[in-house]
């Protein structure tokens, strides 16, 4: 994130909200990276002075964590979100697909199981929310 903030002249406010009880939990490497890259590629607007990115994490069940990345970018139509969500489960490669999101979704499912992965929705800020559900594993 420091590299992105330096590259974009601190043109984005980043907020963190992680429950303390999840700080000792294991997550696969670079779990946020493709989501943050997508924000700067598709949602960041250099003409705005109110670009925001929220990174959150909490325990939603004894055995499940919910991590999320929310932005206040331009968002997507419901139809586009539905197509993107369906493409996450596709093994077919298409240059127009979001390879980073699909790769992350599939890595999560391989590591944590088929009940876990990414969910993409619109949010109240006008942008997108990408929610990551993973199994809670205490770091040893």
Protein language model features and the residues they cover:
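Two-component histidine kinase transmitter core
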Residues: 135-139
């Amino acid at each position: 994130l420091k590299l992105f903030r330096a590259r974009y002249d601190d043109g984005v406010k980043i907020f963190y909200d992680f429950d303390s009880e999840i700080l000792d939990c294991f997550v696969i490497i670079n779990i946020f990276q493709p989501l943050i890259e997508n924000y700067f590629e598709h949602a960041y607007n250099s003409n705005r002075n109110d670009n925001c990115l929220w990174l959150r994490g909490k325990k939603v069940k004894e055995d499940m964590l919910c991590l999320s990345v929310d932005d206040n970018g331009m968002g997507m139509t419901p139809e586009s979100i539905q197509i993107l969500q369906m493409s996450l489960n596709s093994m077919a490669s298409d240059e127009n697909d979001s390879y980073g999101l699909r790769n992350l979704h599939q890595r999560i499912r391989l590591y944590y199981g088929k009940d876990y992965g990414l969910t993409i929705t619109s949010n109240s800020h006008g942008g997108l929310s990408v929610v990551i559900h993973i199994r809670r594993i205490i770091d040893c």
